[in-house]
């Protein structure tokens, strides 16, 4: 009998924010997969290790993806990663693929799941607390009130027009483009808050655009 693939959201950073279902799923999977060269480079693995015992006893697959927008390169990588996971599924082993935040929000996992399911294997998404929800809680404010609109925007693409939308905006994937993001925010006179490494020991809170750094490391 083939194993099953789980895309497990480990939340934004604090292990205590992981859901009970996420913890139980990881405990019951003999194989852990991370989107990095190895577990020592995966923030998601570090988070899960903070609450799931005996993580080091599990087999770990380091399945990194290139930081590029080239779809051909990415699709080739997704296929390769999926094949590595399928090998374990064919051995009858369940695999937990760990993602930061929630697997349904800008996660590599979803592309892998589509390939795995297309090949006839079972897969399931285990939700996690999205980073922007944790950030709003940390700042002590809501993301949207009453009739306010809320927009999630990928900052590694052009954000100028998106920032003109009504309502509040969540800017994600800004790490390597932070200097460009700051420039646009200043040009449009936008107010913004930012939390780096929310819920982690290295957490930093920035209360204005001027306080924000020019770049932060890309999370894995």
What are these regions (language model features)?
Residues 1-15, 20-121, 211-213:
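Class I S-adenosyl-L-methionine
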Residues 1-2, 24-25, 89, 97, ...:
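Solvent-exposed alpha-helices and their adjacent loops that cap or buttress functional pockets
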Residues 5, 163-220:
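A contiguous loop/helix-start segment that scaffolds small-molecule binding in enzyme catalytic cores
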Residues 34, 59-64, 125, 145, ...:
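Structural signal for conserved beta-strand scaffold positions within catalytic alpha/beta enzyme cores
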Residues 39-41, 68, 130-133, 200-202:
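Short gly/pro/ser/thr-enriched loop/turn and capping motifs at secondary-structure boundaries
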Residues 73-82, 138-141, 164-168, 206-212:
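Short, surface-exposed amphipathic charged segments that create phosphate/polyanion-binding patches used
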Residues 78-86, 142-154, 212-220:
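A polyampholytic, Gly/Pro-enriched intrinsically disordered region
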Residues 104-165:
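Class I SAM-dependent methyltransferase SAM-binding "motif I" and its flanking Rossmann-like core
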């Amino acid at each position: 009998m083939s194993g099953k693939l789980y895309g497990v959201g480990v939340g934004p950073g604090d292990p205590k924010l992981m859901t009970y279902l996420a913890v139980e799923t990881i405990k019951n999977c003999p194989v852990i997969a991370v989107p990095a060269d190895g577990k020592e480079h995966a923030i998601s693995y570090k988070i899960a290790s903070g609450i799931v015992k005996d993580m080091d006893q599990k087999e770990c697959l380091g399945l990194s993806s290139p930081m590029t927008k080239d779809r051909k390169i990415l699709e080739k990588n997704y296929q390769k990663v999926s094949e590595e996971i399928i090998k374990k599924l064919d051995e009858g082993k369940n695999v937990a693929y760990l993602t930061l935040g929630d697997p349904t929000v800008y996660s590599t996992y979803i592309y892998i799941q589509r390939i795995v399911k297309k090949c006839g294997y079972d897969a399931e998404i285990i939700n996690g607390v999205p980073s922007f929800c944790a950030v709003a809680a940390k700042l002590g404010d809501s993301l949207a009130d009453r009739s306010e609109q809320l927009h999630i925007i990928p900052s590694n693409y052009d954000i100028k027009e998106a920032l003109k939308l009504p309502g509040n905006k969540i800017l994600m994937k800004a790490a390597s483009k932070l200097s460009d993001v700051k420039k646009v925010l200043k040009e449009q006179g936008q107010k913004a808050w930012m939390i780096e490494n929310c819920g982690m020991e290295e957490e930093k809170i920035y209360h204005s655009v001027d306080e924000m750094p020019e770049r932060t490391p890309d999370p894995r």
